[in-house]
């Protein structure tokens, strides 16, 4: 059995230099998924431990990109979440809410979970 092992080498590349970004006090920071260094650099960490370092100019360009203003395809319609909610609730929902008051439930034989005699 001749098991010739073929080993291929990948070309080496230089590690990209990190740039520090100083954020002004008036700039809102991104969500809590990101971390900052004392110098103001934004970074996140992948589950494998790789650090992804973001530069402020790139983030600001992404923020104003037309892609960020375009919703994803096949997004379900969820009022108030993926589409604006209507100003007035439907009449049936508001009337059913009034009919299902706590007093009606107790009268129907359903008691509260915690009952206490003082």
Curated annotation (Swiss-Prot):
Effect of residue 65 to A: Abolishes phosphorylation by MTOR and increased ubiquitination by the BCR(KLHL25) complex
Modified residues annotated as Phosphotyrosine in this record: 54
Bias type Polar residues, positions: 1-12, 34-48
Effect of residue 37 to A: Abolishes phosphorylation by MTOR and increased ubiquitination by the BCR(KLHL25) complex
Residues bearing the modification N-acetylserine: 2
Family, per entry: Belongs to the eIF4E-binding protein family.
Designated name of the protein: Eukaryotic translation initiation factor 4E-binding protein 1
Gene: EIF4EBP1
């Amino acid at each position: 059995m001749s098991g010739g092992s073929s080993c291929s080498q990948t070309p080496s590349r230089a590690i990209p230099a990190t740039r520090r970004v100083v954020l002004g006090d008036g700039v809102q920071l991104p969500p809590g998924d990101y971390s900052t260094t004392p110098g103001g650099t934004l970074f996140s960490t992948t589950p494998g431990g790789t650090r992804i370092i973001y530069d402020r100019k790139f983030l600001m360009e992404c923020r104003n990109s037309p892609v960020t203003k375009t919703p994803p395809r096949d997004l379900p319609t969820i009022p108030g979440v993926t589409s604006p909610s209507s100003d007035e609730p439907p009449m049936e929902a508001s009337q059913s809410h009034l009919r299902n008051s706590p007093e009606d439930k107790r009268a129907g034989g359903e008691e509260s979970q915690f009952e206490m005699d003082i």
